[in-house]
Amino acid sequence: AGVMAQHLQTMRNKHAITLEHLRFGALKGLILDADGSVIYNLFTEFGITPKSFQWDIATHNSGFNVGQACRELLRYIEENLQGERMSGVHVFVGKDFFEALVKHDDVVEAYKRYQDGLVLRSDMRSGFTFCGITFEEHRGKATAPGGGVRRFVEDDEGHAFPLGTMDTFATYYAPADFNETANTVALPLYAKQEPRKFDRGTDLHTQANPLPLCHRPQLLVKLEIA
């Protein structure tokens, strides 16, 4: 029983990574296949021009105003909410973007006197807030069926999206392809076992059929280092 449970947990973990990969596709306005290929680009399907901002944060003394750029990002998302409310904006960023941001003079100066600069001496990668926007470094990655490794967020970019909206994102599930699951409400994960001939072992099968989707891709914004 213990060995069986370990195998099931390993299979569950693989499904969780796949779901994370698909959800990051939704954050980019894409419906992805398991191998990372694009099935549908929602910007193309709905005739929406993707929005991106160039942040010149890697060049020292560039004069780039991070606070002004944050307010510009907030105003763009607020405008495209079209009357809906949000509780905040979150940005998943890659390591190069994060390093450039936390080393920028505007950010350093803002946190220098807060708790005697404790934040600057701490590991901020799990998230810090600047001008009403929370920035979090994301290091997640997945292995494709062919063996290649894909990062969910590229090192020099970020992906911004609103929090607390009613219907921006959803994850739909389809039932497993078993006789007993036809015309039933889908579950997030299915697991079955079947004994081998002459009781010489047990075969395990797990299945998940998720479809993470962004209903309003115009609220998704890409940030890039200029």
Show which residues each predicted segment covers.
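Secondary-structure junction/capping motif
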Residues: M11, S37-N41, N65, E137, ...
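Sequence/fold signature of self-assembling virion shell proteins
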Residues: V108-A226
